Swiss-Prot record:
3-phosphoshikimate binds at K22, S23, R27, S167, Q169, D315, K342. It comes from Geotalea daltonii (strain DSM 22248 / JCM 15807 / FRC-32). This is 3-phosphoshikimate 1-carboxyvinyltransferase. Gene3D superfamilies: Enolpyruvate transferase domain (3.65.10.10). The keyword Amino-acid biosynthesis applies.
Length: 429
């Protein structure tokens, strides 16, 4: 078991670039494989989750050249994938499994998706139900709710689907299946989730349109290979944003970060807490907004977080909880029940770890109440096999009275392989 320790910091200073966006990296491989011609991808995140997607498409006959800096994908068109000779292993990646389930439902072959012990516990029925309405044939354990998933490719028909959850993975699975469906497919959701799929589908030339409350796509249109420059992942930048806010005397510039408005809930929340965060050098790249983020240490205050802010910051809540634990007053988080079905139950995991660090935390069904304190206590924290829990508690250690040790940190490699090295480079102990 790998263990990491974080010690109290004097300051966090410097300029950094975080690895490429995880969501965009997944989608670049998928659409580059389905497009006609060559797609080049710069800034691809070489984390375990994204490599699982890359390996899956190689197993379906896609040729990908990798020189260490740029991927060159030889796309075979919408119907150019080949039947895999073995089970496709998604590792810990829910994005890989859910999006590929939609994409593979419209193929002309049989495939099976599996994952690690954590992914095999995560709910899949939320994806299978709309796909079944489109005519897909997908089987899974627990009545279709758990992987492994067996997919018998078949003809699909367009549907109008009102999703009960605001989930980019559910929405994206339906849209990818919609590329193969007869007619038009529409998806609406309670609150707008991240829209990377819509943007990249449009960038590759899909017949897709977004409107107030939803998205529609018409099947059958071929995609064309493109050049993609993947921006830095705001979910990875979030750890360093919080680090600079909670350690007095800190100032940090994070360069080239994707600031898609469906992902900037973390910035809105931290600014509402009193965080000194400014965007500089705003520009656009490959259909996505990008900026440099300047963060200065700040006295934070507790706030209420809920509603449409939640899906815009869904992956950042573990480190938001760390910020809340060091804010003046109480932070109330609601409407975040989705956190209970991530890589682990993130509400329970963060409550457990912050309580060990001396923080007053009360769990609710769909969130938590966190009462801030001036300094956290040193402790031994558990990652529960979740990369974001592990990294959040290592950030917490920077503002503790004594060191915080985190058990089982191998999981950090799923999204941020150089996290600890980058953190050490900007932290003065």
């Amino acid at each position: 078991m790998q263990i990491h320790t974080s010690k109290p910091a004097k300051t966090v200073r410097g300029e950094i670039t975080v690895p490429g966006d995880k969501s965009i990296s997944h989608r670049s491989i998928m659409l580059g494989s389905l497009a006609r011609g060559i797609t080049t991808v710069k800034g691809f995140l070489r984390g375990e989750d994204n490599l699982a997607t890359l390996n899956a498409f190689r197993a379906m006959g896609i040729i990908v050249h990798d020189d260490g800096e740029t991927l060159k994908i030889e796309g075979n068109g919408l119907h150019g994938l080949g039947e895999p000779a073995d089970v496709l292993d998604c590792g810990n990646s829910g994005t890989s499994m859910r999006l590929m389930t939609g994409l593979l439902s419209g193929q002309r072959f049989f495939s099976v998706l599996t994952g690690d012990q954590y992914l095999r516990k995560r709910p899949m029925k939320r994806v299978l139900e709309p796909l079944n309405l489109m005519g897909a044939t997908v089987f899974g354990r627990a009545g279709g709710d758990k992987a492994p998933l067996a997919i018998v490719g078949t003809s699909l028909k367009g549907i109008a689907y009102q999703s009960p959850v605001s989930s980019a993975q559910v929405k994206s699975a339906i849209l990818l299946a919609g590329m193969y469906a007869d007619g038009e497919t529409q998806v609406t959701e309670p609150h707008l989730s991240r829209d990377h799929s819509e943007r990249i589908l449009r960038y590759f030339g899909a017949d897709i349109e977004t409107y107030s409350g939803g998205t529609r796509i018409r099947g059958g249109r071929e995609l064309e290979g493109r050049e993609i420059i993947v921006p830095g992942d705001i979910s990875s930048a979030a750890f360093f944003m919080v680090a600079a806010l909670i350690v007095p005397g800190s100032e940090l510039l994070i360069k080239g970060v994707g600031v898609n408005p469906t992902r900037t809930g973390i910035i809105d929340i931290l600014q509402a807490m009193g965080g000194d965060i400014t965007l500089q050098n705003c520009r656009e790249s490959s259909g996505e907004p990008v900026a440099d983020i300047l963060v200065k240490s700040s006295r934070l205050k507790g706030i209420e977080v809920g509603g449409d802010l939640v899906p815009r910051a869904i992956d950042e809540f573990p480190v938001i909880c760390v910020a809340a634990s060091l804010a003046e007053g109480k932070t109330v988080i609601r409407d975040a029940k989705e956190l209970r079905v991530k890589e682990t139950d993130r509400i329970k995991a963060m409550a457990f770890n912050l309580q060990k660090a001396g923080v007053a935390v009360v769990e609710t069904e769909n969130g938590m109440d966190v009462t801030g304190m001036e300094k956290l206590e040193g402790c031994t924290a558990e990652s529960f096999g979740d990369h974001r829990i592990a990294m959040s508690m290592l950030i917490a250690g920077l503002a503790a009275r004594d060191q915080i040790t985190v058990n089982d940190t191998e999981c950090i490699g799923t999204s941020f392989p150089n996290f600890t090295a980058l953190l050490q480079g900007v932290t003065v102990i």
